[in-house]
């Protein structure tokens, strides 16, 4: 299914359809303009996505195109090697993912890099995820990159820290800023080896 950028109008098999409310099966491709996709976490809405006033069902993937495209409506985002998955649909070339409320972002089994922006905001590759409260980084050698004045709060649990109101788990590295310990007993380790300046392990 090829979006047209006009409500209720799509193209498929070289046929232009107008006044369409529903389309079933397959994949969706966006326009060269700004496309807005909506999904839901409600039961029974898996593999459904809405765009241009059309409800697409049993969809496996959405390729948005080259613009500031958005997807909204979910609180569960799962990173892929490229793009991400939500509601059973793989999304590619999305610039912004807007959560409806406190959201969880899950990393891959490979090394992921998370760039902190504002509060509850994480950038992965070319996608900004908004209203995120939890990030489960995954099994790879994962890192979080903050601003020069980034504040990292230890949790007292291995590989788990808090930053920008986001609880990160399964994290191996954090870059930039300052570190604040817990109310418990914290152990910090440094090294005199060359190339380890400004590094600390906790």
What are these regions (language model features)?
Residues 1-202:
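Acidic, glycine-rich low-complexity segments
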């Amino acid at each position: 299914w090829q979006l047209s950028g006009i409500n209720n109008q799509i193209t498929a098999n070289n046929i232009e359809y107008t006044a369409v409310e529903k389309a079933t099966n397959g994949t969706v491709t966006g326009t060269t303009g700004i496309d807005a996709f909506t999904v839901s976490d409600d039961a029974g809405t898996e593999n459904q996505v809405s765009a241009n006033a059309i409800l697409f069902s049993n969809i496996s993937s959405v390729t948005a195109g080259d613009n500031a495209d958005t997807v909204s409506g979910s609180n569960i985002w799962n990173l892929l090697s490229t793009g991400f998955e939500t509601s059973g649909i793989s999304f590619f070339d999305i610039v912004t993912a807007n959560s409806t409320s406190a959201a969880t972002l899950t990393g891959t089994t490979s090394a992921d890099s998370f760039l902190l922006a504002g509060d509850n905001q994480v950038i992965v590759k070319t996608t900004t995820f908004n209203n995120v409260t939890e990030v489960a980084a995954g099994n790879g050698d994962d890192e979080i990159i903050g601003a020069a004045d980034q504040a990292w709060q230890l949790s007292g649990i291995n590989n788990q820290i808090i930053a920008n109101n986001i609880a990160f788990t399964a994290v191996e590295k954090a870059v930039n800023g300052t570190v604040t310990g817990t109310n418990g007993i914290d152990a910090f380790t440094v090294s005199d080896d060359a190339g380890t300046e400004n590094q600390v392990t906790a």
